[in-house]
Amino acid sequence: MKYHHGNLKENLIQQAVLACEESGWENISLRNLAKQLNVSQTAPYRHFETKEDLLAEVAAKGFEKMNADMNKTSNFLASGLAYCDFALKYQNTYDLMTGNSLGSFTQYPALLDQAQSAFITLENNLEAHLINLGHSDLPKDIIEEKALSVWAFMHGIVGILRKTETASEDAPASEGPMKIMNNLSKNWDEFIEKSIKNILSI
């Protein structure tokens, strides 16, 4: 099937989004995508000078999806759980979004915009949450600091949760954080909510 040149760019992005989760962003190639879409080997280069330019679009789509998931609820704690759920469901995309493979996001305006929008969503939800708790007079820098702390916690807990997923059930950790995480495995949501509340304590 031939794709009309007018929508080839979006088709390439969507195909790359799927390929990212199926086989990892490292294995994406413009040549393979061109073959899958039945276009010439040079066609993708009319829209993306390099593979990294395409991967930046994939990462931007990831931030857009994560932001949308976080915006589905007005509850701040629930939006934090939505972040973790996204990161665990779309692990390859999340690695691309949060890793160093693309370098500075300033090279990719669309990606930078989506990444900033996701953080602003977290920050705004946090501010609304704190106001509901009676903290309506907090300085902006305190709110930003709290938002960054929550973001860092969620990023860290995702890494630990993924490590826990790959741990062998036949050889559970006997000591240390992995043992604790294994013990908490049936109550992740409760643990995450409690931890975020501790971070937000004022």
Describe the role of every protein-language-model region.
Residues 28, 32-35, 44:
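Append "Primarily bacterial transcriptional regulators
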Residues 60-79, 98, 116-117, 121-134:
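Amphipathic alpha-helical linker/stalk segments
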Residues 107-134, 144-148, 182-201:
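Amphipathic alpha-helical packing segments from all-alpha helical-bundle domains
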Residues 1-23, 31-32, 53-56:
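Basic, helix-initiating cap at the start of DNA-binding domains
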Residues 148-171, 179, 194-202:
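Amphipathic C-terminal alpha-helical segment
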Residues 89-109, 159-171:
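Amphipathic alpha-helical segments used for helix-helix packing
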Residues 68-93, 140-150:
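Hydrophobic alpha-helical connector segments
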Residues 9-14, 26, 38, 46-71, ...:
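An amphipathic alpha-helix adjacent to DNA-recognition modules
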